[in-house]
């Protein structure tokens, strides 16, 4: 069964690895070794196949089995979020007791990890395994988490599962229009791209190209040219969400990809502001727009360099955040693009440059101030 471009088994394994589990075991009902199909699904991962009658890692992990070991059991029909699996790995639980939820996910802390692995190798279904372990260790309820996992009952649940996964891709740090308009479009595109071989980096380059193509249209003072450039700018912003969505959806995140995405986005902003400045200078025959443009570009690059680490972490503000931190957060959103579209429809995109020449340096100073207050 394939869910959002990945076989469900591989998705479960990659989520477990992303959650920080040191070992991921996959139970195979195939006797006499792992099934070749499972081997292909696990290719490139650190997962090990657990077959009937075999208990891999027991000997090599001998010293570790004497200590308390956290084991999470997940049926093959449950689509997990990595953060949910991480919470199962880290939460405090009563030892030597099986904690289970309605989706047949279970967690146990035990010094007898070998017994759990042997039972997992012996029983072919999650229901049988959970029943046997509950009889041995006793049972306790594990709080159900509809946000953290999606239980599939049949192939017909594939579309709802994909919708659930896509909704989880919406970031904490998003403006109103980005969350309620752009994300709806980008997620629809990502849903169709997920089964293909299109990579996140490829989408970053497509988005970058569209944004850079749109920038020169702001050299003109004609409304139709400016509006076309603004619509390309908006298209860039929408498609800019697809690369990160694909990366998170298919576990393809990388530092290289995050850097390419972040600086590609800011390169488009610099190009748009620079072209607005040159266009206004050509229209007025004055040099001061070039100074305003230079100030905006320098502040944009400085703000990007300063804020890049926090932005890529996707951290949300706490409830007790100061008003300056909240104001800096609000300035970082890209809802300003819609103002560019409206102004461009009247041939007044240059007005936005005037606003940006004040707002962008202000944002940069706010970042410096917030950072200084946090260090104090």
Residue ranges and their predicted role:
Residues 200-256:
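Membrane-embedded alpha-helical segments that form the functional core of polytopic membrane enzymes
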Residues 187-195, 244, 248, 258, ...:
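Short amphipathic alpha-helical coupling elements at transmembrane boundaries
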Residues 53-60, 250-256, 317:
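Juxtamembrane helix-boundary/capping and inter-helix hinge elements in multi-pass membrane proteins
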Residues 96-97, 101-187, 262-376:
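A feature for the membrane-embedded catalytic helix bundles of lipid/isoprenoid biosynthetic enzymes
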Residues 1-39:
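N-terminal glycine-rich phosphate-binding loop and ensuing alpha1 helix
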Residues 35-107:
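Conserved beta-loop-beta/alpha segment of the NTase-like Rossmann-fold superfamily
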Residues 192, 212-216, 340-345:
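Alpha-helical transmembrane segments of multipass membrane proteins
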Residues 9, 77, 199:
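Residue-level signal for inorganic ion chemistry
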């Amino acid at each position: 069964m394939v869910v959002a471009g990945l076989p469900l088994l591989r998705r479960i394994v990659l989520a477990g690895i992303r959650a920080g589990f040191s070992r991921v075991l996959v139970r195979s009902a195939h006797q006499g070794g792992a099934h070749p199909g499972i081997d292909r699904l696990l290719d490139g991962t650190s997962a090990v196949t657990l077959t009937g009658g075999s208990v891999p890692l027991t000997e090599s992990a001998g010293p570790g089995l004497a200590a308390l070991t956290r084991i999470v059991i997940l049926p093959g029909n449950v689509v997990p979020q990595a953060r949910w699996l991480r919470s199962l790995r880290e939460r405090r639980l009563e030892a030597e007791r099986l904690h289970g939820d309605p989706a047949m996910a279970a967690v146990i802390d035990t010094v007898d990890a070998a017994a759990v692995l042997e039972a997992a190798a012996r029983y072919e279904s999650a229901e049988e395994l959970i029943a046997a372990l509950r009889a041995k260790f006793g049972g306790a309820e594990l709080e159900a988490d509809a946000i953290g996992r999606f239980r599939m009952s049949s192939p017909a649940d594939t579309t709802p599962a994909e919708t659930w996964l896509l909704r989880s891709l919406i970031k904490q740090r998003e403006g109103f229009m980005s969350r309620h308009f752009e994300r709806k479009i980008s997620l629809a595109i990502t849903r169709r791209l997920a089964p293909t071989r299109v990579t996140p980096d490829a989408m970053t380059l497509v988005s970058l190209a569209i944004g850079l193509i749109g920038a020169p249209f702001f050299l003109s003072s004609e409304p139709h040219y400016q509006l076309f450039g603004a619509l390309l700018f908006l298209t860039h912003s929408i498609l800019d969400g697809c690369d990160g969505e694909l990366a998170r959806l298919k576990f393809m995140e990388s530092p290289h990809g995050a850097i390419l995405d972040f600086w590609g986005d800011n390169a488009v902003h610099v190009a748009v502001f620079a072209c607005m400045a040159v266009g206004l200078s050509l229209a007025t025959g004055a040099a001061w727009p070039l100074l305003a443009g230079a100030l905006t570009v320098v502040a944009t690059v400085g703000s990007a360099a300063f804020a890049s680490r926090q932005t890529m972490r996707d951290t949300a503000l706490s409830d007790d955040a100061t008003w300056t931190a909240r104001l800096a957060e609000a300035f970082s959103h890209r809802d300003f693009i819609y103002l560019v579209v409206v102004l461009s429809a009247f041939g007044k995109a240059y007005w936005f440059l005037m606003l940006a020449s004040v707002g962008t340096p202000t944002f940069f100073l706010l970042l410096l101030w917030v950072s200084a207050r946090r260090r104090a």
